[in-house]
Amino acid sequence: MYKRQNQDDLDIPAGADNVRSDAYYKMEKPSRLVGFMPHMHNRGKRQCLEAIYPDMRVEQLNCVNYDFNWQIVYNYADTVAPLLPAGTIMHVISWHDNSAANRNNPDPRNWVGFGNRTTDDMARHWLTYYYMTDDELKAETAERTRQKSNGTQQN
């Protein structure tokens, strides 16, 4: 499966740095996360991915500095790919830099909102995942726990 989230209400004031926006997506079925790809434009600075589990535990899964010149998919190794029970909320946090200090910023004097043009900005992300059955999730979780306790888990 493949999921893309938009943050169409993006609001980046002129000259502002570290402008935060948040997006959420609920995993309806047990899943294994395969990859994460942040996507912003010239003012994109950083994007982080958190899992908010049904028991309200929060785990940071990925946090990357963003560079518009590099469109990178961060793939997880099989042994550490996040295993997500049904009901897990994916929380994506994005930061933008609309200041003069951002060398990629075409004009820090202007307010910037969502748009598809490079001179606009966005805070999108793509999640690549596949669904698992409850039994598959339990078995994989148990196997990882066993490997971790035996010291045989590979990263």
What do the predicted segments below correspond to?
Residues 1-5:
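Conserved small/polar residues in nucleotide/adenosyl-binding loops
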Residues 7-11, 26:
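Conserved, well-structured core segments that form or line functional sites
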Residues 14-17, 87:
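Solvent-exposed, conformationally flexible loop/turn segments
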Residues 16-27, 74-76:
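Short beta-strands within extracellular/lumenal beta-sheet-rich domains
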Residues 22-32, 80-85:
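Extracellular and analogous surface-interaction loops
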Residues 35-118:
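Extended, compositionally biased non-globular segments
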Residues 101-143:
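Glycine/proline-rich low-complexity spacer/linker segments in large multi-domain proteins
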Residues 138-155:
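Activation corresponds to long, low-complexity, non-globular regions
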